[in-house]
């Protein structure tokens, strides 16, 4: 049985070094029926998780996670990260937090990402972004 600390360390290294060709290694880290959730996806199972990451590599140039803090308490880890990538020649950069649950075998049974999709994506869309900026400004006053 793998220790959860070792599982977390391996998971962090995988995410920081992940490339499209590494997606075949997802079963080394995720339980068969693991759940992955972020602001755009809520999927269950390695095949569906693979599709989420495959899509990320299709739509973004050089996506990269840089993990700068991780805390493990029992079977739950909280991981703070920076994400960078480019889409249509526009550079993306944002901070996020992941809550990751490990099972008894050291595999991820749940990975939930928290980050502000409205600021990172929707605010940059021409029509929707203008509306959201207007609403945000009105709410601030």
Role assignments for model-derived ranges:
Residues 1-24, 28, 138-141:
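Short, low-complexity N-terminal intrinsically disordered segments enriched in polar/charged residues
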Residues 8, 12, 50, 129-136:
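Generic detector of well-ordered alpha-helical segments enriched in charged/polar residues
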Residues 24-75:
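A solvent-exposed, acidic/Ser-Thr-rich amphipathic alpha-helical stretch
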Residues 58-64, 68-141:
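A beta-strand edge to alpha-helix "cap/lid" segment located at domain peripheries
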